[in-house]
Amino acid sequence: MPREKGRKVVASNRKARHDYSILDTYEAGMALTGTEVKSLRAGRASLVDAFAQERNGELYLHGMHIPEYVQGTWTNHEPRRTRKLLLNRIEIDRLIGKTRESGLTIVPLQVYFSDGWAKVEIGVAKGKKSYDKRQDLAKRDAQREIARAAGRRGKGMAD
């Protein structure tokens, strides 16, 4: 069976973009078992409470939930197991260096298939304070209101 081309998003972490300001993003592969890949292809995954952490010079993804494959047998995987992230050595060293700075962490933003390979987009993030979240919400509401007004003006409806 040939691999499909393009990018098919399986799961995205919307809460990460709300709780953190993303400074930089990277694309990483994941070391997965066969049943994990099949479960991902079925569109079943959750990135809630997931994070990446350094151990022995490698990066590992903790807390990502991939449910057991429905048609799997005794070879099924553990849903919340730690998964190794596959990156170049230079990228790993750069990420480890950034996380050693105060207040920075690595969070997964989305899981997707790129040309048939399971990938995770990870971001170097800094936690937002509650007032930052309120400011972002106010900005988003203002942008939405501007777009709504522009849409009315384009349709010939005046306020």
Swiss-Prot record:
Q: Which HAMAP family match?
A: SmpB
> Its biological function?
Required for rescue of stalled ribosomes mediated by trans-translation. Binds to transfer-messenger RNA (tmRNA), required for stable association of tmRNA with ribosomes. tmRNA and SmpB together mimic tRNA shape, replacing the anticodon stem-loop with SmpB. tmRNA is encoded by the ssrA gene; the 2 termini fold to resemble tRNA(Ala) and it encodes a 'tag peptide', a short internal open reading frame. During trans-translation Ala-aminoacylated tmRNA acts like a tRNA, entering the A-site of stalled ribosomes, displacing the stalled mRNA.
Residue pairs linked by disulfide bridges in the UniProt entry: none
Q: Which GO terms describe its cellular component?
A: cytosol
Question: Which Pfam families does the annotation name?
Answer: SmpB
| Keyword hit for RNA-binding | yes
Q: Per its UniProt record, what InterPro entries does this chain match? A: SmpB (IPR023620), SsrA-bd_prot (IPR000037), SsrA-bd_prot_CS (IPR020081)
Similarity comment: family membership: Belongs to the SmpB family.
What GO terms describe the biological role, i.e. biological process, of this protein? trans-translation
Single Gene Ontology MF annotation: RNA binding
Ordered alphabetically, the record's keywords are: Cytoplasm, RNA-binding
Tell me what organism the protein belongs to.
Salinispora tropica (strain ATCC BAA-916 / DSM 44818 / JCM 13857 / NBRC 105044 / CNB-440)
Q: Which PANTHER family match?
A: SSRA-BINDING PROTEIN, TMRNA-BINDING COMPONENT OF TRANS-TRANSLATION TAGGING COMPLEX
- Record's protein name: SsrA-binding protein
Q: What is its main location?
A: cytoplasm
